[in-house]
């Protein structure tokens, strides 16, 4: 019972999604090889990053417990129900944070540790706070969400270069339509707690146009690894095909479907697209 609640506090779904994108960065650096040579490092960086993301999610839960209690989709979270106290959650998050730093420092490299720490600070210290204050919080949160693939890449090469920037841009531009789709689907919940989400402040019609704008930027960014010479023809073809398909389905839905169906379409294909891209990167 308690193990399940502590696991829930760490948001395993978010961890899993971020580890998929981390894998994309790792595969780009190793040219789609995770053999005996790279397997230990792959395991270490996965564990280290997973622990840091889990820590970030725990502290996010602590800060958000007041609004979580008022939203339908979050009202059963452990801190809201009282299954876990704030003190217990703080200790838990701190332990996860320390373990992550130890794993990344001793078993991966210092650069990757600093990159992940930056992601943690942006997520907990900037995004979590700013989402109550500004419509731009989603964009700020996109910075932290674009960190894992960069960490996967630097775990192997131990440098920041244009390939790392390309990975960052791909994930950053992907996250905006993905996140705004979620905001549209749960707009009633966000209205309850008066969060200044873009669909609430600027309206659904404006939000849909912004989503398509970032989707177009995402399509362009998907070509960057191949342009830089780090991704092969197979990876380039897969990336461009799935990105263009997502763009096509989203535009099609924009023209013919209701707002909710449009949001579901963008969200559903965002998951398929980023998974396909990350698992064929290299």
From Swiss-Prot:
Question: What protein does this entry describe?
Answer: Protoheme IX farnesyltransferase
Subcellular localization, as worded in the UniProt entry? Cell inner membrane
Its record classes its membrane topology as: Multi-pass membrane protein
Q: What class of enzyme is it?
A: transferase
Gene label: cyoE
Q: Name one GO biological process term.
A: heme O biosynthetic process
What is the role of this chain?
Converts heme B (protoheme IX) to heme O by substitution of the vinyl group on carbon 2 of heme B porphyrin ring with a hydroxyethyl farnesyl side group.
| Enzyme nomenclature, EC number | 2.5.1.141
Q: Where are the transmembrane segments?
A: 9-29, 39-59, 79-99, 102-122, 139-159, 165-185, 210-230, 231-251, 261-281
Query: What's a Gene Ontology MF term here?
Result: protoheme IX farnesyltransferase activity
User: Does the entry feature the keyword Secreted, yes or no?
Assistant: no
Pathway, per UniProt?
Answer: Porphyrin-containing compound metabolism; heme O biosynthesis; heme O from protoheme: step 1/1
The further comment given in this record reads: Carbon 2 of the heme B porphyrin ring is defined according to the Fischer nomenclature.
Name the catalysed reactions.
heme b + (2E,6E)-farnesyl diphosphate + H2O = Fe(II)-heme o + diphosphate
Q: Which domain of life is it from?
A: Bacteria
Kindly name one Pfam family recorded for this protein.
Answer: UbiA
The record's section on HAMAP family has: CyoE_CtaB
Phylogenetic placement of the source organism? Bacteria, Pseudomonadati, Pseudomonadota, Gammaproteobacteria, Thiotrichales
Q: Which organism is it from?
A: Francisella tularensis subsp. holarctica (strain LVS)
* Family affiliation: Belongs to the UbiA prenyltransferase family. Protoheme IX farnesyltransferase subfamily.
PANTHER family xref list: PROTOHEME IX FARNESYLTRANSFERASE, MITOCHONDRIAL (PTHR43448:SF2)
Protein keywords: Cell inner membrane, Cell membrane, Heme biosynthesis, Membrane, Transferase, Transmembrane, Transmembrane helix
Q: Which GO terms describe its cellular component?
A: plasma membrane
């Amino acid at each position: 019972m308690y193990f399940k609640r502590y696991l829930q506090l760490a948001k395993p779904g978010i961890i899993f999604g971020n580890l998929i994108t981390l894998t994309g960065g790792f595969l780009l650096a190793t040219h789609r090889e995770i053999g005996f040579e790279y397997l230990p490092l792959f395991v270490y960086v996965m564990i280290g990053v997973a622990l840091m993301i889990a820590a970030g999610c725990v502290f996010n839960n602590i800060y958000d417990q007041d609004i979580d209690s008022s939203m339908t989709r979050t009202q059963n979270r452990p801190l809201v129900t009282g299954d876990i106290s704030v003190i217990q959650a703080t200790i838990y998050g701190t332990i996860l944070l320390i373990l992550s730093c130890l794993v990344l420092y001793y078993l991966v490299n210092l650069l990757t540790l600093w990159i992940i720490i930056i992601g943690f600070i942006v997520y907990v210290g900037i995004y979590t706070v700013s989402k109550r204050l500004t419509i731009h919080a989603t964009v700020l949160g996109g910075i932290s969400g674009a960190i894992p693939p960069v960490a996967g890449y630097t775990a192997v090469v131990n440098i920041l270069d244009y390939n790392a920037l390309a990975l960052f841009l791909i994930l950053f531009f992907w996250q905006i339509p993905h996140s705004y789709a979620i905001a549209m689907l749960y707009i009633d919940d966000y209205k309850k707690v008066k969060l200044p989400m873009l669909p609430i402040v600027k309206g659904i019609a404006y939000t849909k146009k912004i989503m398509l704008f970032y989707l177009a930027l995402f399509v362009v960014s998907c070509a960057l690894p191949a342009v830089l010479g780090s991704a092969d023809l197979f990876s380039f073809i897969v990336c461009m095909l799935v990105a263009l398909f997502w763009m096509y389905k989203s535009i099609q839905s924009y023209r013919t479907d209701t707002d909710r169906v449009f949001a579901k379409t963008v969200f559903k294909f965002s998951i398929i697209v980023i998974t396909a891209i990350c698992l064929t990167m290299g």
